[in-house]
Amino acid sequence: MKALRLSASALFCLLLINGLGAAPPGRPEAQPPPLSSEHKEPVAGDAVPGPKDGSAPEVRGARNSEPQDEGELFQGVDPRALAAVLLQALDRPASPPAPSGSQQGPEEEAAEALLTETVRSQTHSLPAPESPEPAAPPRPQTPENGPEASDPSEELEALASLLQELRDFSPSSAKRQQETAAAETETRTHTLTRVNLESPGPERVWRASWGEFQARVPERAPLPPPAPSQFQARMPDSGPLPETHKFGEGVSSPKTHLGEALAPLSKAYQGVAAPFPKARRPESALLGGSEAGERLLQQGLAQVEAGRRQAEATRQAAAQEERLADLASDLLLQYLLQGGARQRGLGGRGLQEAAEERESAREEEEAEQERRGGEERVGEEDEEAAEAEAEAEEAERARQNALLFAEEEDGEAGAEDKRSQEETPGHRRKEAEGTEEGGEEEDDEEMDPQTIDSLIELSTKLHLPADDVVSIIEEVEEKRKRKKNAPPEPVPPPRAAPAPTHVRSPQPPPPAPAPARDELPDWNEVLPPWDREEDEVYPPGPYHPFPNYIRPRTLQPPSALRRRHYHHALPPSRHYPGREAQARRAQEEAEAEERRLQEQEELENYIEHVLLRRP
C-alpha cells in the first residue's frame, strides 16, 4: 500500500506540472463530457491500466472541460449544480484491481450503484428552484476499508478534476476575466454617457464622461452589498468537506488543494458578477443625478446673479456719491453768490431793520395769541407772520454766509503754494483802489504774494474766478470803512405797545346763587340732571367746545356749584403792560442789537486779518 501511495503522489506531481505547463492560453472549443452512469461503467469494468495509460484520457478530458467563454465564467450556472458536479467528481468510485479485489467486488458494486442513483436524483432535481439539499450517501467508516478506499484510479480522477479547476483559475485566466469585465463595464459606461448627453433636460450641461458627471453629483446612499451565494454559504473556505472522509487520513493532498480551489472559485464568481449592478444604474439613479445637477446649476446661477447685483449697487452708490458732491459744490457757490448780493443790498441798516421787524412781528404774534386765548387766528396775521419769518430767515442766511466765507478763507490762508503771481488780481485791485475816495496809505500798497496764492487756491476750490474773490474782499473792506466813518447811530426809543383791537367791557358781578333745591335721592344720582332748564344753551367758550355741550355726570361738581358758567375778563396786566415792563423790553432789545453789532464787527476784523494782511 505504501508503494501505491508513493506512486499516486508522484503521478499527482507529474500531472500537475504537465497540466500547468501545457495549458493553452486560448479558449478551447470542446465541451466537458456529460457525467452519467454510462460513462462510468466502462471505466469500472476494464482492467486496471498502468498509471500513464489511465492518466491520458483523464488529462484530455480535463483539458477539454474548460468553458468556451471565459468572460462569462459560471454566469448561467446554478451554484447548487456546480456543487453537485464537484461532489460527483470527488465521490467517483475507482475500479478494483483484478487479482486482489475479487473478495470486495460485491460491496464496491453496491456502493457504486447507490452512488449512481444518488447522482441521478440530484441531476434531475437541479432545475427546481427550491430543492432540498441532497443527503450524503451513507459510507462505512471502518478502519478496515479506509486504506482500501484510497485506490490509485480514484486518486487519478480527483487529481484530474483538481487540475481542471487549477487551469480555470490560473493567473492568466484571472487576468483575462478582469480585462473582459473591465471592457464590458466601460462599454456600458459609454452607453450610459451617450444616452445621458443626448437626452433633453439639464443633463446637456455636463459634456463629459459619466465618471466626471458622477464626481460632480453628490454621493447618494451606497448600494447594498450582494448577498452571498448559496454555493458560498454551503461551501465555506476554511471548513473541510464532509465527503472527503473516504480518502482516509493518509491522503490529505486532494482535500487541501480542493479547499484552496473552492476559495478563488467563490471569489471569482462574486468578482465577475459585481461590476454589472454597479454599471447598470437604474433610471431612478439617473433622475436623482439630473436633479442634483440642476440644483448645482441653479446655485451657480444664483451666485453669479448676486455678484452682479452687488457690483451694480456699488456702481450706483459711487455715481450717487459723485452726483451729490457736484450738487453740494454748486449749491455752495450759489449760496455764496446770493448771500453776498442780499447782504450788499440790505447793508448794516437793512439787517438791523430786519431784526427789529422780526422782533416786532414776534411780539405782535404773542400778544395776539394772548388776546384770543385759543381762538382761531386771522388769515392776515398768518401772512404777516410768514413774511416776517421769511425776512428773518434771509437775514440769518446772510449772516451764516459771511461766517462760512470767513471759515473758508481761514482754512485756505495757511496753505503756502509756490505759484507764479497772476497780474489780474493785482491789476484789478489797483483799479479798485484808484476809484476809491482818498484812502489811506495802506491802500496804495500791493497785496503780498502769500495773500495772492491763498486767493488763487480759494478760487480754485470754490470754482470761482480770482476777480470775483477779490471783488468780494473789496466790498467787505468798503463796508468796514463806511462803518468807521459813519456817525454812531442813536439808540432807538422803545416802541409803544400796540393798541388792542377790541376792548371788552367789564362784566357785571355774578348774581347770588339760588338756594339749593331738594336733591334727588341717591339711587337716582346716575340719571341726567333734571333740574337743568330745558331752553338752557351754553355758548361756545373755553369750557364748551361747541354749543349745548353736556359734560359727563361723573366729572361734574355738585349741582349747587354748576348752575351757570361766566366768562370773566382777563387781567389787564397781560394786555396793558406797565412802564416797568416796557423799559425792561427796550433794554433787552438794545442789548440784542449791541450783541449783533459786536458780532458783525468781529467778523469783519476776522476777514481783514486773514485776507488783507500787509507785509
Curated annotation (Swiss-Prot):
Compositional bias (Acidic residues): 378-394, 434-448
Top-level division of the source organism's lineage: Eukaryota
Low complexity compositional bias, start-end: 179-194
Signal peptide: 1-22
Tissue/organ expression: Central and peripheral nervous systems, synthesized exclusively in neuronal and neuroendocrine cells.
Sequence positions bearing Proline amide: 577
Pro residues compositional bias, start-end: 25-35, 129-141, 487-497
A biological process from GO: ovarian follicle development
UniProtKB keywords: Amidation, Antibiotic, Antimicrobial, Cleavage on pair of basic residues, Cytoplasmic vesicle, Growth factor, Phosphoprotein, Pyrrolidone carboxylic acid, Secreted, Signal
GO cellular component, one term: transport vesicle
Modified residues (Phosphothreonine): 424
Biased composition (Basic and acidic residues): 415-433, 577-599
Residues bearing the modification Pyrrolidone carboxylic acid: 310
Sequence segments annotated as region (Disordered): 22-201, 218-257, 342-600
Phosphoserine modifications at: 420
GO MF, any single term: growth factor activity
Free-text description of this protein's post-translational modifications in UniProt: Multiple peptides are derived from VGF, with activities in synaptic plasticity, antidepression, penile erection, autonomic activation, and increases in energy expenditure.
Protein name (record): Neurosecretory protein VGF
Organism whose genome encodes this protein: Homo sapiens
